From Swiss-Prot:
<dbReference type="GO" id="GO:0016114">
    <property type="term" value="P:terpenoid biosynthetic process"/>
</dbReference>
<keyword id="KW-0414">Isoprene biosynthesis</keyword>
<dbReference type="GO" id="GO:0019288">
    <property type="term" value="P:isopentenyl diphosphate biosynthetic process, methylerythritol 4-phosphate pathway"/>
</dbReference>
<feature type="binding site">
    <location>
        <position position="42"/>
    </location>
    <ligand>
        <name>a divalent metal cation</name>
    </ligand>
</feature>
<comment type="pathway">
    <text>Isoprenoid biosynthesis; isopentenyl diphosphate biosynthesis via DXP pathway; isopentenyl diphosphate from 1-deoxy-D-xylulose 5-phosphate: step 4/6.</text>
</comment>
<dbReference type="InterPro" id="IPR020555">
    <property type="entry name" value="MECDP_synthase_CS"/>
</dbReference>
<feature type="binding site">
    <location>
        <position position="10"/>
    </location>
    <ligand>
        <name>a divalent metal cation</name>
    </ligand>
</feature>
<feature type="binding site">
    <location>
        <begin position="34"/>
        <end position="35"/>
    </location>
    <ligand>
        <name>4-CDP-2-C-methyl-D-erythritol 2-phosphate</name>
    </ligand>
</feature>
<keyword id="KW-0479">Metal-binding</keyword>
<dbReference type="InterPro" id="IPR036571">
    <property type="entry name" value="MECDP_synthase_sf"/>
</dbReference>
<dbReference type="Pfam" id="PF02542">
    <property type="entry name" value="YgbB"/>
</dbReference>
<feature type="binding site">
    <location>
        <begin position="8"/>
        <end position="10"/>
    </location>
    <ligand>
        <name>4-CDP-2-C-methyl-D-erythritol 2-phosphate</name>
    </ligand>
</feature>
<feature type="binding site">
    <location>
        <position position="8"/>
    </location>
    <ligand>
        <name>a divalent metal cation</name>
    </ligand>
</feature>
<feature type="site" description="Transition state stabilizer">
    <location>
        <position position="133"/>
    </location>
</feature>
<comment type="subunit">
    <text>Homotrimer.</text>
</comment>
<dbReference type="GO" id="GO:0046872">
    <property type="term" value="F:metal ion binding"/>
</dbReference>
<dbReference type="GO" id="GO:0008685">
    <property type="term" value="F:2-C-methyl-D-erythritol 2,4-cyclodiphosphate synthase activity"/>
</dbReference>
């Protein structure tokens, strides 16, 4: 068994969509990023890559490569997970924290869990999501950014049989 930890942060700006776990969250601002800016999927991707010792999201999808401009983060995670699972890894669970001042994430939590489960082809009961605010402190607390943390526990299916 191995654990991985992922983190991502993006500024929030007007005129962009707010994407969270592959779900569009209606809001006046969205993530400013090279891809679609889905901080939650980016954090999960980094957690999985770290657990497998396969680097990080920037190595797989460098922002300097125009091919990844406005890329769908669901597709990025799916691509990475396909490679990891081909190497024999399975997910035990993924635990996430979204840090955002507004909007409230709770009304979207189950849809986000379903979306992530669909991307990774696992049960939504293996995915846990919590949301916190910045308590008015710092760039997140002022509503100018969003961040996400994700941890994962994976195991090699060859050692479980």
């Amino acid at each position: 068994m191995r654990t991985g930890l992922g983190y991502d942060l993006h500024r929030l700006v007007r005129g962009k969509k707010l994407m969270m776990g592959g779900v569009h969250i209606p809001f006046k601002k969205g993530e400013k990023a090279h891809s679609d800016g889905d901080v939650l999927l980016h954090a999960i991707t980094d957690a999985l890559l770290g657990a497998c010792g396969m680097g990080d999201i920037g190595e797989f999808f460098p922002p300097s490569d125009k091919k990844w401009k406005d890329a769908n983060s669901s597709e990025l995670l799916s691509t990475v997970w396909e490679r990891i699972s081909e190497a024999g890894w399975k997910i035990q669970n993924i635990d996430c924290v979204i840090i955002i001042e507004e909007p409230k994430i709770l009304p979207f939590r189950e849809e986000i869990r379903k979306s992530i489960a669909g991307i990774l082809k696992i049960e939504k009961e293996q995915i846990f999501i919590k949301a916190k605010t910045g308590e008015g402190i710092g760039i997140i607390g002022r509503g100018k950014a969003v961040a996400a943390l994700a941890s994962c526990l994976i195991f090699c299916r060859h050692t479980q049989e």
